[in-house]
A protein has these predicted regions:
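Generic hydrophobic transmembrane alpha-helix motif, especially the helices
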Residues: 115-151
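Transmembrane alpha-helical segments of polytopic membrane transport and secretion proteins
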Residues: 1-28, 262, 266-284
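Hydrophobic alpha-helical transmembrane segments of multipass integral membrane proteins
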Residues: 73, 77-85, 89, 93, ...
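Amphipathic cytosolic juxtamembrane alpha-helices at the membrane-cytosol interface
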Residues: 102-106, 174-202, 282
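Transmembrane-helix boundary motif in ABC transporter permease subunits
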Residues: 82-114, 127, 284
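Periplasmic/extracellular loop-to-transmembrane helix junction in inner-membrane transport proteins
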Residues: 7-23, 42-84, 245, 252-263
Length: 284
């Protein structure tokens, strides 16, 4: 009797399972298709304008050249500086919260602050970075100002991903290492962190992706210069100089055309209708 009831239930569930599987596959195919469509569209539209000279030269009005080499170097520079600061702090904070700190008000406050930082708009980070790092610390528009600001933005991402990665490590690893006489730090360094490394790397990659795509915060902190350093020593001096990333250059390229168009339209209306808004004899 029980076997017949089970078979009847299985048969009645089959249609629902079938439609569920179909819906899941359709959603997955649509997601991949949209991503591939965006990549193909950008590639087809942009491949004509990209060449070796465009990638290896800088934009110069005097020389009449257009390129993004300086912006590529600036982007890599900001990524390296930001990750050198944010990764140790984020991983260290996650290790403390997960392995050392006892559940209580302090841990709750730190986790609440982390979640709050993750939800703040990037423009707010940019304004804070401009006022605190740029003006109060006198770093002005520079790579350091932009990197310090981006560190605050990506810290929650690295911390939360590292925490989740550490939680996936079985407790038997911890108890086994302690039982064999290993110290806690030795156990964390040789067992927990290597076991959680895939999750930590995922957090780092997500943080790098956010840095590469960020423009609002860097517009207020790093500036928009796309110049290349002339020497290896100049590379270190450039840390205190303005530096425009690829997203900043993209933003400026799009907005400058709009500004020129709006300015031209305003001049035409001014000469045609006059300052008082009345018809004028002046020609556009």
């Amino acid at each position: 009797m029980t076997g017949s009831n089970t078979s009847i239930r299985t048969k009645t569930r089959h249609p629902a399972d079938f439609f569920t599987y179909v819906a899941i596959y359709v959603c997955a195919i649509l997601s991949v298709a949209l991503l591939l469509g965006i990549i193909v569209y950008v590639f087809v539209k942009g491949i004509r304008s990209v060449n070796w000279e465009f990638l290896t030269s800088v934009t110069s009005v005097l020389k009449g050249t257009t390129g993004i080499a300086g912006n590529i170097v600036n982007t890599l520079y900001i990524i390296i500086v930001t990750m050198l600061i944010a990764t140790p702090i984020g991983v260290g904070a996650a290790v403390y919260l997960n392995e050392y700190a006892k559940p209580g008000k302090l841990v709750s406050m730190i986790e609440f602050a982390t979640e709050t930082l993750a939800g703040i708009p990037s423009i707010i980070f940019g304004l804070f970075g401009m006022m605190f790092f740029g003006q109060t610390l006198h770093l002005k528009y520079s790579i350091l100002t932009g990197s310090f600001t981006l560190t605050l933005m990506v810290l929650p991402l690295i911390t939360r991903n590292t925490q989740e990665a550490l939680k996936t490590v079985p407790d038997s690893y911890r108890s086994g290492a302690i039982g064999l006489g290993a110290g806690k730090w030795h156990m964390i360094r040789t067992i927990l962190l290597p076991s959680a490394m895939p999750g930590i790397i995922t957090g780092v990659i997500l943080a790098i992706g956010r840095i590469v795509g960020e423009s609002a915060a860097l517009l207020f902190t790093a500036g928009s210069s796309g110049l290349l350093p002339k020497s290896f020593a100049d590379l270190f001096a450039k840390a205190k100089m303005p530096a425009g990333t690829l997203t900043i250059q993209l933003y400026l390229s799009a907005t400058c055309r709009t500004v020129r168009r709006v300015t031209f339209t305003g001049k035409v209306k001014y000469y045609r209708y006059g300052a008082e808004g009345k018809p004028s004899l002046k020609r556009a």
